[in-house]
Amino acid sequence: RWSSPGYADLMVGTSADVAFADAWLKGVRHFDVRAFYQSALKDATVVSPLAGTGRKGLQRSIFNGYTDTAVDEGLSWSMDGYINDFAIGNLAAALAAAPAADDPYAAHYADDAAYFHQRALGYVNLFDPAVGFFVGRDAKGNWREDAKHFDPLRWGGDYTETNAWNMAFHAPQDGAGLAALYGGRAGLAAKLDAFFATPGAFHVGSYGEPIHEMLEARDVRMGQYGHSNQPSHHIIYMYDVAGQPWKTQDKVRDVLSRLYIGSEIGQGYPGDEDNGEMSAWYLFSAAGFYPLRMGTPAYVIGAPYFPHMDIALDNGRHIVIDAPAVSDTNRYVQGLRVNGQPWNKLTLPHALLAQGATLEFLMGPTPSRWASDEAALPPSLTPHGRPQPLRDPGAATSSTPTIAGLTALFDNDSASEAVLPATSTTIAWHYAAPRRVALLTLTSAARAAAPSGWQLQASVDGHHWRTLDTRQQQRFAWPRQTRAFAVPAPGEYAHYRLHFDAAPDASPRALAEIELLGPTP
């Protein structure tokens, strides 16, 4: 969770997940990716018995789609979780595309990829359109505060070492989907403009007194932008997503020119140098590109800081960045050539840079329309429209034979569970209108073994049934683990049933939760 070293109950997110997934997807092969994947899977799907490991609030957040307000700073836990889920999904997709013959988990990567990619869209669950910000919700879905009492300048509460303004852009994995929440790319740009224009005042909120991050953010003098701490570091580059890259270029130059020079107002290193991120931000930004969408083998383009920069790679090759006219005045990119060829996109593939490359920037004193059309922008999970994570809307359920405490399987909380008979057992769902089920999830119980074989069936009329998916010899590696199973050919049905095979050892089995996930109408 946090490089302390060792386990420590600090900060939010299990960001080793995105860090190692990103490394693998960029070609780093000096670690055991299978062991890492299982570690990331455990972070994302297993309720940890230890406070210093795993993700907080997971017993409900997996099913609600967000970490609720019963968890301190649950919104920040949620938002970092979506970024990590995105990276896990991308790694799973890569491993599914090229499975190793001796990998015992090979058959499951594709299911995981589908599951984690849709989980990465869960940020939409915390966006309150009444206030235009991400806001915490309780387990029942109620907002922490209504529009009358909401204060985007207040630190803490839902937000770790920051406020609602600095969490307003915390979905780099799905920039176009985020933009849709603000009315489109122009709306995202307007929200960013307001962010940088809002005076750098702060309200201490749940912290009770100023903490150093508040004071450092104020001293940045770029509105609410707090370059002093990690939650803000990607925000400038979100102008690329909004289709206004000249504003990224302008503000990157401002940060590099003012916030790293020292002496004037005590800035120098402008804040927390946690695990080297402040230096890394400088080096990437000075080179003219930045890893905005961690967990993908690509970078977004900003603007170079130096007339000439040469990065020597371990393979003996070089990334050469030339911008002979660049200056505080000539801060805007007018054009770019990569290895001598015109480049009109805002992304650079990692593989291209890793083999050595020459980037030639043409700079000028005024903004240009270079790489600002739709086709030039960074990709997103949701290319168009509002994000639509899969949901389980609930339905009338029954079981044969009768399962005592059946409702525990549908209460969005893995702390409760139900015991299934050792004999074959069927659970049925009856919806008021036909719906499509794309994923089945099962969550193992705390102690008893989970079922190992089942068939998911569906019916239009409740009488004629079609088998959608069959699984055999399934295993849950950990207690209270949520596993996802993709439906190969989903259709529109009003009736579903899950038929569990009899236990091979004739002993009862147990589950903590079942979900039938599909798109919402």
Residue ranges and their predicted role:
Residues 2-14:
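Aromatic/His-enriched, Gly/Pro-containing loop or helix-boundary segments
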Residues 350-383:
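C-terminal beta-strand-rich structural cap/linker in extracellular carbohydrate-active enzymes
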Residues 175, 235, 283, 336, ...:
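Hydrophobic, well-ordered secondary-structure elements that form the walls
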Residues 13, 17, 27-320, 324-325, ...:
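Active-site core of glycosidic bond-cleaving carbohydrate-active enzymes
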Residues 304-306, 328-333, 447-455:
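Short coil-to-beta strand junction motifs in C2/discoidin
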Residues 386-412:
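Predominantly extracellular/luminal regions of secreted and cell-surface proteins
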Residues 314, 338-341, 461:
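Short strand-turn-strand beta-turns centered on an Asx-Gly dipeptide
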Residues 404, 408-472, 479-521:
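Aromatic, loop-rich ligand-recognition surfaces of beta-strand-rich domains
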